[in-house]
Design a protein with these regions (language model features):
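Acidic, mature catalytic/reactive cores of soluble proteins
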Residues: 1-298
Length: 298
């Protein structure tokens, strides 16, 4: 149940660009076998972030601009890739999701199977839907890994892991032309368009900025960033703050520390009231919870 019953559906996106018969990684990933390391940073020309992250890659006369956005209030991620092929040969962009479908922090199950039916992926009792204007190409199910997570290992989390693949999305761009690849992955059957996800996120952020009333650019950026930590608690139907996201849950202490800066300073008094009501719903002996009971746990 939201927000603490988290499931990792897609671990990462393996982005590649094929030019002149050579496949070049745009994404980056360490492997236990260092010779297999994918280092797309070598081709990254720029990175910007306002309402959403945007990466720019330049490879042998081709430019790829990637944008990603989370749909507000939905379990949906939208992707837009703009490819400008100034080269003399066809460019093929390939996006391969690395799938897991397991609770956060857990490994793939032994023999875990992923079923692809049209644009629906099922595994481990869970389903993910997608839509794209590119070509969805089924692949024989295969494992990717073992990946190396050096920074996670420093925190005592697993230092290595695996993921599965069973499809990719492709878009071919002839020389001298520009094309756009769009894709949306979501847990709901009714999928928004990629452009809708971006426009809703932008509209939400403009509304937050107007409510806060700040004119300073840094202050407006903090208002946008603070809004990303507000979540809805399914057990109470009210708001809560994931102050330590993505690592921690909505701990009472951290939520109360974050509430003045994330909500009151941003002019979000009704949301602040909802957060307090969420915690007061579990008040006991004059104390509010530091952790919420989930699934029958105390």
């Amino acid at each position: 149940r939201a927000p603490n019953r988290r499931v990792q559906m897609i671990q990462r996106l393996e982005d590649t660009l094929t030019l002149n018969g050579r496949t070049i990684p745009l994404s980056s990933q360490d492997f236990e076998d260092r010779a297999r390391r994918a280092d797309g940073r070598a081709y990254q020309a720029a990175f910007t972030f306002r309402d959403y992250p945007q990466w720019t890659y330049q490879v042998q006369g081709a430019e790829v601009v990637k944008r990603a956005a989370l749909m507000p209030g939905e379990n949906a991620v939208a992707l837009i890739y703009e490819i400008n092929n100034r080269g003399r040969s066809e460019a093929v962009l390939r996006v391969t999701p690395h799938l897991r479908f397991v609770p956060k922090g857990e490994a793939l199950l032994p023999g875990q199977q992923f079923t692809l039916e049209g644009k629906r992926i099922s595994s481990n009792g869970r389903t993910l839907y997608f839509q794209t204007n590119g070509q969805a190409v089924p692949l024989p199910q295969a494992l990717r890994g073992p990946f190396q997570f050096a920074q996670d290992a420093m925190d005592g989390k697993p230092a290595a892991g695996w993921a599965a693949v069973n499809h990719c999305i492709e878009l071919s761009v002839p020389p001298g032309e520009s094309r756009t690849l769009e894709a949306v992955y979501a847990t709901a059957h009714t999928l928004p368009g990629a452009a809708e996800a971006f426009s809703r996120l932008e509209a939400q952020n403009r509304a937050l900025e107007r409510r806060a009333g700040f004119t300073d650019g840094a202050a407006r950026a903090l208002v946008r960033a603070a809004g990303q930590f507000l979540s809805r608690r399914e057990s109470t139907g009210g708001h809560t703050i994931l102050a330590g996201f993505p690592f921690f849950e909505d701990w009472g202490r951290d939520t109360m520390i974050a509430l003045p800066g994330c909500l009151l300073a941003a002019g979000r008094c009704q949301e602040a009231k909802s957060v307090l009501e969420t915690f007061l719903a579990y008040e006991q002996d004059g104390l509010v919870p530091n952790l919420f009971p989930e699934g029958g746990e105390e």
